[in-house]
Amino acid sequence: MALVNEHFLKLPGSYLFSDIAKKVNTFKITHPKRDIIRLGIGDVTRPLPKACIEAMHKAVEEMTSAETFRGYGPEQGYDFLIEAIIKNDYAPRGIHLSPTEVFVNDGAKSDTGNIGDILRHDNSVGVTDPIYPVYIDSNVMCGRAGVLDTESGKWSNVTYMPCTAENHFIPAIPEKRIDIVYLCYPNNPTGTTLTKAELKKWVDYALANDTLILFDAAYEAYIREPDIPHSIYEIKGAKKCAIEFRSFSKTAGFTGVRCGYTVVPKELTAATLEGERIPLNRLWNRRQCTKFNGTSYITQRAAEAIYTPEGKEQIQETINYYMTNARIMKEGLESTGLKVYGGVNAPYLWVKTPNGTSSWRFFDQMLYEANVVGTPGVGFGPSGEGYIRLTAFGERDDCIEAMRRIKNRL
């Protein structure tokens, strides 16, 4: 008899965004003539950069000829893309990487969810709270998260580090030792950031406690202020304690194309029970060769085009578009008296609900009264209660109209 992985049965009945979709669909059935503006899920709306489209067309044409046809590619990614990544994303910041330290993937979500494959199931886990749900759910699936306390919404083997207005959304360094810590900066969902000095405290903690930092830098392209690190490897010693995840989804509109990459430094190691130090780069490479057949050649050529002069210019135009949306939304919400965080170095706005209203209650008010969809903050963790997340990835006119509705109807 085949037995199931019973850890999956511990997961909530559905994913956060599935719950939102059900509520929105119910509303649409009962209010078919209402025009809904979606500012909840972080999907993009601007088209792919022209440079990427042209590169994809060229790559498709190559597939029509036996001389230039490409079949299976390297599981780690093609050299042309890896070299472009190192040259453009790391070398200008004084970060030196070997090509074998970069692994191209089909989006950061895959690797942030799968990285646990190379780590023991009983490692302790620390997360900032609120947090991207994938970090928690992927640890639940392998049994690492422990048991859920339904009253608090917390898992027994997870240390939650609250990020609230009271601590300026800066997580406190844990007093106890934690094996694995997830950090995402610029942060999803709060849109806030850490300075280099603040991030250095985490690197120092990790080095002192033999802690592995899993650093999600998917939104680094949106950073505007000078003292905000784009990579954890800007901090001395980080290569000995951190894995970094990057994505082209929000940088270049690749949410439907699917491409990103993970950096696993060769000097990063973890221990066996006997105390032997094992390079995580070697384990991750072995895992990828077994479970991943590589990102498509056509997709990787499109990603390479991001780093051309034309690609860089076109991507910056798109990022500026979304960040202008963020400014318009932030100003619009603040004009109604709402307290808004984020939206300066990230395309997310973290809105405090008025008068102590719960996250889901305010979600319903926005949906039914303003016909605007956000994401309830409590869906990102216990410290998200009393907040709602809005994204700046919508069309400009929709963002303006949504602010008008919120101001006039709520």
Swiss-Prot record:
Pathway(s) of this molecule: Amino-acid biosynthesis; L-lysine biosynthesis via DAP pathway; LL-2,6-diaminopimelate from (S)-tetrahydrodipicolinate (aminotransferase route): step 1/1
Gene from which this protein is expressed: dapL
Family: Belongs to the class-I pyridoxal-phosphate-dependent aminotransferase family. LL-diaminopimelate aminotransferase subfamily.
Subunit comment: Homodimer.
Record HAMAP family: DapL_aminotrans_1 (MF_01642)
Modified-residue entries (N6-(pyridoxal phosphate)lysine), positions: K250
Reactions it catalyzes: (2S,6S)-2,6-diaminopimelate + 2-oxoglutarate = (S)-2,3,4,5-tetrahydrodipicolinate + L-glutamate + H2O + H(+)
Chain positions recorded as pyridoxal 5'-phosphate binding sites: Y72, A108, K109, Y132, N188, Y219, S247, F248, S249, R258, N293
UniProt EC number: 2.6.1.83
Protein name, as recorded: LL-diaminopimelate aminotransferase
Cofactor(s) required for function per UniProt: pyridoxal 5'-phosphate
Keywords of this entry: Aminotransferase, Pyridoxal phosphate, Transferase
Biological process annotations from GO: lysine biosynthetic process via diaminopimelate, diaminopimelate-aminotransferase pathway
GO MF terms, alphabetically ordered: L,L-diaminopimelate aminotransferase activity; pyridoxal phosphate binding
InterPro entries hit by this protein: Aminotransferase_I/II_large, DapL/ALD1, PyrdxlP-dep_Trfase, PyrdxlP-dep_Trfase_major, PyrdxlP-dep_Trfase_small
Positions with a binding annotation for substrate: Y15, G42, K109, Y132, N188, N293, R389
Biological role stated in the UniProt entry: Involved in the synthesis of meso-diaminopimelate (m-DAP or DL-DAP), required for both lysine and peptidoglycan biosynthesis. Catalyzes the direct conversion of tetrahydrodipicolinate to LL-diaminopimelate.
